[in-house]
C-alpha cells in the first residue's frame, strides 16, 4: 500500500462525524494492507509509531521540515516508510540526535506536502484523527470478519491494538484466540468510574464489595515458580524498583499467581504518605537501596487474575476474591466489606477516610475482570469530586506565578469524536515546585513557539483535578465547565487514553442536577 492511501484515510476519518462512516473507512484501509504492512499501518491509524518514541521533539521535526521541500507527487510505500522509521529508532550513542534528524529529513524530502504533515504529526504523537481505540476495534472486527467483542478481549490481553489487528487480519478468530493471559506478561488494569457517594454506588450495584481506595501506585504482580515480576499501571516492568513487593510475593506458597493491587508508602502509624512520596520509588534512575530505607513500600492486593495454574479473568469477582483469600494472607489484602446496607457502607467509608485514604471502591460481585475497561462494575467514591483530565494548553502567569506556565487548559477525552473537550482552566493548588516542574515539562511539549501568552501543548499529561461541581457553560464546546477547580497532582502513571471521558463528566452533571432538584 502507498502511504498516500493511509494519509487520505486519516484525513477523511478526521473530518467525518459519524462513527459508522469512520469504521467503514478504517476497515477498508485495514483490508488493503499487505501482510508485512499490517502492524505498522494499524499503528499509524491508531496515531502511534510501531517503534514507540524515537527521540525527536518539535524543534527537530520543524528543522527537518524547513530544511527540505515537498516532493511533487506522493510516491512513498508503507513498507519503506516503516523501514526508515526502524533506522531512526535504532540510532544510538554519540551523534544519534543528528543522525535521527538527518534520517527524518531524508524521509520528508521524498514525501508530498500531505504526507509530510502526516509523518510530522505521527512522529510527534499529535496525529489526532478521530480514530480512537473503540472505533478501531470495530474497524478491525469488520475488516477481519470477527466479533468486535473478541477483538476487544484480545486487546485487553495484549495491552495494545496493533498486534491484535495484525493477527485478526491474518488469521481471523484463530489469531485472536492466541491472546490470553500469560504469566510474566502484563494485561491492562481494570478501571473504575466515579460515583457521587456510597448510596449511589449501592443503588447501582446492589450488594457489593467495598474496598478502601488507597492512594498508592497500582501494581500487577506475576509469579511463575521462583520468578516474580512487577508491572506498573502503564505496563512498565518496575521489578528492580520494588524489592519489597517481589519478596512478599515470592514468599507466598502458590507456584503461579497474577495479582492486582497497590504499592504504597505507609508511615509508622499506618497512615499513607502523600502520593508523591510513594511515586519516588518509581523513577527511571533510582538508588533502590537508599530509597527502600527512606521510603519503604507495603503492598496490598485486591484481585487475583490467576492462581495455582488457573486463569480467573472471566470468573465473577466473588470467586476471584475467594481465590485471592486462599492465596494471600489478610495482612497483604486491602480491607473489604460486602454489604448492601447504606449505613454500614458509610461507616466503612468514614473508617477509610479517618486513616488517611482516598475513599472507597464499590465492586460488583458478579462482574468478570474487564481488563483495560472503565466500566460500571467498579465505582470509586471519594469525599471531593475529582476527574483525571488532560492538559491542552497553559498560560504564562503573573505575580507569584510570573515566569511560570501556570493557568492550565483542561480537557476530557472524547472517544466518539476523537481528541479532547475543554472544560475549563485553573492555576489553583500548585506549589512552587510544581510550577517549576510543569513549566520545564510544558516547554518540551509545546506545539510551536512558547513566546505567546497561551502555549498549546501535545496532549500527553494527565492531571487529577478536584472541583466543587459542574455548571452549564456556552464558553466551552462540551457545554459544561468545572466550578472552583484546583490541581491535586499530576498522574504520570496514566496515559491520555486513560483520562476521564466527556460522557463521564456529563453523567456527573446529570446526577448533580438530580440531587439539587431532589429527584
Curated annotation (Swiss-Prot):
List ligand-binding residues for ATP. Answer: 211, 218, 233, 262, 302, 374, 380
Q: Which cofactor does it need?
A: Mg(2+)
Say if the entry is tagged with keyword Cell division: yes
Name of the top EC class for this enzyme: ligase
Matching entries from InterPro entries are given as: ATP-dep_DNA_ligase (IPR050191), DNA_ligae_ATP-dep_bac/arc (IPR022865), DNA_ligase_ATP-dep (IPR000977), DNA_ligase_ATP-dep_C (IPR012309), DNA_ligase_ATP-dep_cent (IPR012310), DNA_ligase_ATP-dep_CS (IPR016059), DNA_ligase_ATP-dep_N (IPR012308), DNA_ligase_N_sf (IPR036599)
Active-site residues?
213
Disulfide linkages recorded for this protein, renumbered to the chain, are none
Q: Which domain of life, per UniProt?
A: Bacteria
Q: Which Gene3D superfamilies match?
A: DNA ligase, ATP-dependent, N-terminal domain, DNA ligase/mRNA capping enzyme, Nucleic acid-binding proteins
> What reaction gets catalysed by this protein?
ATP + (deoxyribonucleotide)n-3'-hydroxyl + 5'-phospho-(deoxyribonucleotide)m = (deoxyribonucleotide)n+m + AMP + diphosphate
GO biological process terms on file: cell division; DNA biosynthetic process; DNA recombination; DNA repair; DNA replication
Q: Which UniProt keywords apply?
A: ATP-binding, Cell cycle, Cell division, DNA damage, DNA recombination, DNA repair, DNA replication, Ligase, Magnesium, Metal-binding, Nucleotide-binding
The protein's GO terms of the molecular function aspect are: ATP binding; DNA binding; DNA ligase (ATP) activity; metal ion binding
Which PROSITE patterns does UniProt cross-reference here?
DNA_LIGASE_A1, DNA_LIGASE_A2, DNA_LIGASE_A3
Q: What is its EC number?
A: 6.5.1.1
Which PANTHER family does this entry report, sorted A to Z? DNA LIGASE 1/3 FAMILY MEMBER, DNA LIGASE-RELATED
Briefly state the protein's biological role: DNA ligase that seals nicks in double-stranded DNA during DNA replication, DNA recombination and DNA repair.
Q: Which family does it belong to?
A: Belongs to the ATP-dependent DNA ligase family.
The protein in question is named Probable DNA ligase
Amino acid at each position: 500500500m502507498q502511504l498516500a492511501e493511509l494519509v487520505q484515510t486519516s484525513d477523511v476519518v478526521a473530518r467525518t462525524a459519524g462513527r459508522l462512516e469512520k469504521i467503514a473507512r478504517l476497515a477498508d484501509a485495514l483490508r488493503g494492507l499487505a501482510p508485512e504492512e499490517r502492524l505498522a499501518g494499524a499503528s499509524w491509524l491508531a496515531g502511534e509509531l510501531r517503534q514507540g518514541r524515537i527521540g525527536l521533539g518539535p524543534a527537530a521535526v520543524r528543522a527537518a521540515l524547513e530544511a527540505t521541500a515537498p516532493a511533487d507527487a506522493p510516491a512513498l510505500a508503507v513498507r519503506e516508510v516503516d523501514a526508515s522509521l526502524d533506522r531512526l529508532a535504532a540510532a544510538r550513542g554519540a551523534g544519534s540526535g543528528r543522525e535521527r534528524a538527518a534520517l527524518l529529513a531524508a524521509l520528508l524530502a521524498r514525501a508530498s506536502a500531505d504526507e509530510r504533515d502526516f509523518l510530522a504529526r505521527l512522529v510527534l504523537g499529535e496525529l489526532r484523527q478521530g480514530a480512537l481505540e473503540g472505533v478501531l476495534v470495530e474497524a478491525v472486527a469488520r475488516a477481519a470478519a470477527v466479533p468486535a467483542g473478541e477483538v476487544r478481549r484480545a486487546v485487553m490481553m495484549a495491552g495494545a491494538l496493533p498486534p491484535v489487528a495484525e493477527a485478526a487480519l491474518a488469521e481471523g478468530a484463530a489469531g485472536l484466540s492466541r491472546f490470553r493471559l500469560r504469566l510474566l506478561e502484563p494485561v491492562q488494569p481494570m478501571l473504575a468510574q466515579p460515583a457521587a457517594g456510597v448510596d449511589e454506588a449501592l443503588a447501582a450495584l446492589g450488594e457489593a464489595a467495598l474496598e478502601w481506595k488507597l492512594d498508592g501506585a497500582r501494581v500487577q504482580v506475576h509469579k511463575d515458580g521462583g520468578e516474580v515480576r512487577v508491572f506498573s499501571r502503564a505496563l512498565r516492568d518496575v521489578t528492580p524498583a520494588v524489592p519489597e513487593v517481589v519478596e512478599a510475593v515470592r514468599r507466598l506458597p502458590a507456584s503461579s499467581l497474577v495479582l492486582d493491587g497497590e504499592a504504597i508508602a505507609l508511615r509508622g502509624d499506618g497512615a499513607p504518605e502523600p502520593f508523591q512520596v510513594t511515586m519516588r520509588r518509581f523513577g527511571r534512575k533510582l538508588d533502590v537501596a537508599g530509597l527502600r530505607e527512606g521510603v519503604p513500600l507495603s503492598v496490598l492486593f485486591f484481585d487475583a487474575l490467576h492462581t495455582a495454574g488457573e486463569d480467573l479473568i472471566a470468573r465473577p469477582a466473588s470467586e476471584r476474591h475467594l481465590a485471592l483469600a486462599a492465596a494471600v494472607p489478610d495482612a497483604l489484602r486491602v480491607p473489604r466489606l460486602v454489604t448492601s446496607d447504606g449505613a454500614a457502607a458509610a461507616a466503612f467509608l468514614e473508617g477509610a477516610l479517618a486513616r488517611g485514604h482516598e475513599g472507597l471502591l464499590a465492586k460488583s460481585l458478579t462482574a468478570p475482570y474487564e481488563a483495560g475497561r472503565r466500566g460500571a462494575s467498579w465505582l470509586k467514591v471519594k469525599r471531593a469530586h475529582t476527574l483525571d483530565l488532560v492538559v491542552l494548553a497553559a498560560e504564562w502567569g503573573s505575580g507569584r506565578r510570573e515566569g511560570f506556565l501556570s493557568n492550565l487548559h483542561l480537557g476530557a477525552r472524547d472517544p466518539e469524536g476523537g481528541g479532547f473537550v475543554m472544560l475549563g482552566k485553573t492555576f489553583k493548588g500548585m506549589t512552587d515546585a510544581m510550577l517549576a516542574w510543569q513549566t520545564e515539562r510544558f516547554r518540551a511539549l509545546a506545539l510551536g513557539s512558547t513566546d505567546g501568552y497561551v502555549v498549546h501543548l501535545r496532549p500527553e499529561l494527565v492531571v487529577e483535578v478536584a472541583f466543587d461541581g459542574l455548571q452549564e457553560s456556552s464558553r466551552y464546546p462540551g457545554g459544561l465547565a468545572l466550578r472552583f477547580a484546583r490541581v491535586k497532582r499530576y498522574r504520570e502513571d496514566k496515559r491520555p487514553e486513560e483520562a476521564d471521558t466527556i460522557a463521564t463528566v456529563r453523567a456527573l452533571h446529570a446526577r448533580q442536577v438530580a440531587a439539587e432538584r431532589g429527584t
